[in-house]
């Protein structure tokens, strides 16, 4: 987990001539300072930093084309950088190269309220986008825990707490533009709600983790802001009863907007970090969207289901400030959990299974975690079968690294055996390449590799991620 890049990923040469060309073109928007490179060579993954040779702050698609063409001429890797919130090492420059910082490409290019779409640059964050939409009566619902960039969310096929109602980035990106490894720009998709025109290149780039090109524009779906919103918290006597409540809620068709599971250890961490007073038991957070009558009906149904499974009295959060406090605490759960073991790093699992197998998967995982000496809180978007274990390790203790790898492998292999996936929303990055092969098989990975070779024949686009260059 905490090992440097393997020898097969040796750094490539970074010619002085390339640096001179970048500086003559972009001036002060090029940095080789240790601090800037260090900031762009780490993320929220457990891996040691891997610094790029230089960072360039792009301001337009034309800038990115120029950077890519110069790097291609010299055979230097390119790593796109959004907000730095990856949990899988996507941003690490394992072969050196140029980090393209997209944070200054943060404009809303067009809002099409009648069509419920918006086109944005990749550096805008989800919070910035929703702030820009505030007066339109519309919102963009996908909300991973971090305030991630829309470009990064697209590149990792991200989702979040309300995917159970609104889907993931896969369902919500209608089209995009990307700069390929040779500097050409491709535009995929349209603003039409559907299309049967050719290969679905939009879906190819959504989840490509920067390995096929640099995404420069994204068109996403918007949704009307609901008339009524209500949130609630409910504690349960066991993990199994909490999860079964969720499964029954989904199976009877309640259109719940969010349902999050937080185990008792994670609740303790959240209480301390966010100054809450939740019962330190296995807990579900709910949110309901709709009309006043619809929300009341949904809440009543779910409350009855929870009571059948030992749920202890709903605590309601109907005021916007109370809901914000609750969901901010959930979104900060990762950092809260790190405080359970000061100085630790977290190896974070991301399995997702069919909802029919969720209870079995979570219960068997809980048994594994109870037998481990490591603290391992669990949180999850259980409404769509996705949950995360944060395995907290001391990176200086090899035995803890080994134990984390053992637990991680058991959790992933269990999910795959249940027709699930090794990653529901974080992506493959550096950490899950072996699991990708287990999940899909060698022939499927060879097909992915053939696409990569066709679009990026010199392996310049974020090399070392998703799968190895050679079979």
Task: Describe each region flagged by the PLM.
Residues 32-41, 223-224, 230, 235, ...:
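C-terminal substrate-recognition/cap domain of FAD-linked oxidoreductases
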Residues 107-260:
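FAD-binding subdomain of flavoenzyme oxidoreductases
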Residues 28, 416-428, 453, 457-461:
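Alpha-helix capping/hinge segments and adjacent helical runs
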């Amino acid at each position: 987990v905490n090992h440097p890049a393997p020898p097969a990923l040796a750094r490539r040469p970074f010619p002085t001539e390339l640096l001179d060309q970048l500086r003559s073109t972009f001036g002060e928007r090029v940095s080789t300072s240790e601090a800037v490179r260090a900031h762009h060579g780490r993320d929220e993954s457990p891996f040691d930093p891997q610094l790029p040779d230089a960072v360039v702050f792009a301001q337009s698609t034309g800038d990115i084309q120029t950077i890519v063409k110069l790097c291609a001429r010299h055979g230097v890797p390119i790593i796109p950088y959004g907000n730095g919130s990856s949990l899988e090492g996507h941003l690490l420059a394992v072969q050196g190269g140029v980090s393209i910082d997209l944070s200054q490409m943060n404009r809303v290019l067009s809002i099409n309220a009648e069509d419920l779409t918006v086109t944005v640059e990749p550096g805008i964050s989800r919070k910035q986008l929703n702030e820009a939409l505030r007066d339109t009566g519309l919102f963009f619902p996908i909300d991973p825990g971090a305030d991630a960039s829309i470009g990064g969310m697209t590149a990792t096929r991200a989702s979040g707490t309300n995917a159970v109602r609104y889907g993931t980035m896969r369902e919500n990106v209608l089209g995009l533009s990307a700069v390929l490894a040779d500097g050409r720009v491709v535009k995929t998709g349209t603003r039409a709600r559907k299309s049967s025109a050719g290969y679905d290149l939009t879906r190819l780039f959504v989840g490509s983790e920067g390995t096929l090109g640099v995404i420069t524009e994204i068109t996403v779906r918007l949704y009307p802001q609901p008339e009524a919103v209500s949130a609630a918290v409910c504690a349960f006597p066991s993990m199994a009863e909490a999860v079964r409540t969720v499964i029954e809620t989904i199976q009877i068709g309640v259109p719940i907007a969010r349902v999050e599971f937080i185990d008792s250890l994670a609740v303790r961490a959240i209480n301390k970090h966010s100054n809450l007073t939740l019962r330190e038991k296995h807990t579900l957070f709910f949110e309901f969207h709709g009309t006043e009558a619809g929300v009341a009906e949904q809440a009543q149904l779910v409350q009855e289901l929870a009571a059948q499974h030992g749920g202890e009295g709903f605590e309601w959060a109907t005021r916007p400030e109370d809901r914000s406090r609750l969901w901010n605490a959930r979104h900060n759960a990762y950092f809260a959990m790190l405080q359970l073991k000061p100085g630790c790093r977290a190896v974070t699992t991301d399995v997702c299974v069919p909802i029919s197998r969720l209870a079995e998967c979570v219960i068997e995982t809980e048994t594994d975690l109870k037998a481990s000496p490591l603290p391992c809180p669990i949180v999850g978007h259980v409404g769509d079968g996705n949950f995360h274990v944060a395995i907290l390790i001391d990176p200086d203790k090899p035995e803890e690294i080994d134990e984390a790898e053992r637990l991680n492998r058991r959790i992933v292999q269990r999910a795959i055996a249940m027709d699930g996936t090794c990653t529901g929303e974080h992506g493959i990055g550096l950490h899950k390449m072996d699991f990708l092969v287990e999940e899909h098989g060698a022939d499927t990975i060879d097909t992915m590799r053939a696409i990569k070779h066709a679009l990026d024949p010199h392996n310049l686009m974020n090399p070392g991620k998703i799968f190895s260059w050679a079979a």
